[in-house]
């Protein structure tokens, strides 16, 4: 019998995996809890979001537990992955409103009844972090040299990467740890541009919890110029045309 991972691979969803043998073993052991993050820097998701949404739908249809994580906390910083310039900084009110809009959209694609899927917002835990404790307990597990070598930062290093953006990888990794510890989530999925951030999460879980966690990336939907289809690209096709 095919696992959900086999189905996703056959349908062309899989780009990179941390360890395919271990991921297949994870799916063979039973139902899997996975999560995908959604960036609330606009009031609507776009066509590039359909790949991760469809992946969650496949996971759910095959009896797995899915978590849609809206980045109400990380959105206050901005993800530098694949960007040549710093993102526009949005206010807390703007981020909160965008997060509500994305949540409503996700309810159209996933079944959240009876906790079949969970809609979470990382602002619920990231905004409550004690900075000194976070540096001591989490930050010490990160190598600056390895972070600077990550593809997600290479482009920005040429034009300037500020300290706020440099923290993004650490916060996303902490999200994975939080979901692993509190929801039994052992699999993160997302776009291929998130590979470095996702690996940081699996490493953090291994160092703090002493357990295996896994990551799977999807191919990116690109524009005619080969750029990632994102919220700031010209000609973006929004899922909510309004």
Segments from the language model and where they lie:
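Non-catalytic terminal extensions that flank enzyme cores
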Residues: 1-40, 240
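Divalent-metal (Mg2+/Mn2+/Ca2+)-assisted nucleotide/phosphate chemistry catalytic cores
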Residues: 11, 91-92, 98-100, 104-222
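Short, flexible loop segments at the rims of nucleotide/cofactor-binding pockets, characterized by
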Residues: 12-15, 44-45, 166
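N-terminal catalytic cores of NTP/NDP-binding nucleotidyl/phosphoryl-transfer enzymes
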Residues: 22-80, 188-195
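Short acidic, glycine/serine/threonine-rich loops at helix termini
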Residues: 78-82, 129-135, 227-233
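A charged helix-plus-loop insertion that forms the helical arch/lid used to bind
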Residues: 80-96
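Catalytic adenosine-cofactor/nucleotide-binding cores of aminoacyl-tRNA synthetases and other
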Residues: 140-143, 219-242
């Amino acid at each position: 019998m095919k696992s959900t991972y086999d189905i996703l691979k056959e349908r062309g969803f899989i780009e990179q995996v941390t360890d395919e043998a271990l991921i297949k073993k994870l799916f063979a052991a039973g139902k899997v809890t996975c999560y995908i993050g959604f960036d609330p820097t606009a009031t609507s998701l776009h066509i590039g979001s359909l790949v991760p949404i469809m992946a969650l739908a496949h996971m759910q249809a095959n009896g797995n537990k899915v978590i849609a994580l809206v980045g109400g906390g990380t959105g206050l910083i901005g993800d530098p992955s694949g960007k040549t310039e710093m993102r526009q900084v949005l206010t807390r009110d703007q981020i909160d409103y965008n997060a509500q809009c994305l949540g409503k959209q996700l309810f159209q694609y996933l079944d959240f009844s009876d906790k079949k899927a969970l809609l979470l917002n990382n602002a619920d835990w990231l905004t409550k972090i004690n900075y000194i404790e976070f540096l001591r307990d989490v930050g010490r597990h990160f190598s600056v040299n390895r972070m600077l070598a990550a593809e997600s930062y290479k482009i920005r290093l040429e034009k300037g990467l500020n300290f706020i953006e440099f923290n993004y990888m650490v916060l996303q990794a902490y999200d994975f740890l939080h979901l692993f510890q509190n929801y039994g989530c052992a699999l993160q999925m997302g776009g291929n541009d998130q590979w470095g951030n996702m690996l940081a999460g699996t490493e953090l879980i291994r160092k703090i919890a002493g357990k295996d966690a896994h990551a799977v990336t999807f191919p990116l939907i690109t524009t005619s110029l080969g750029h990632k289809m994102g919220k700031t690209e010209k000609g973006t096709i929004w899922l909510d045309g309004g």
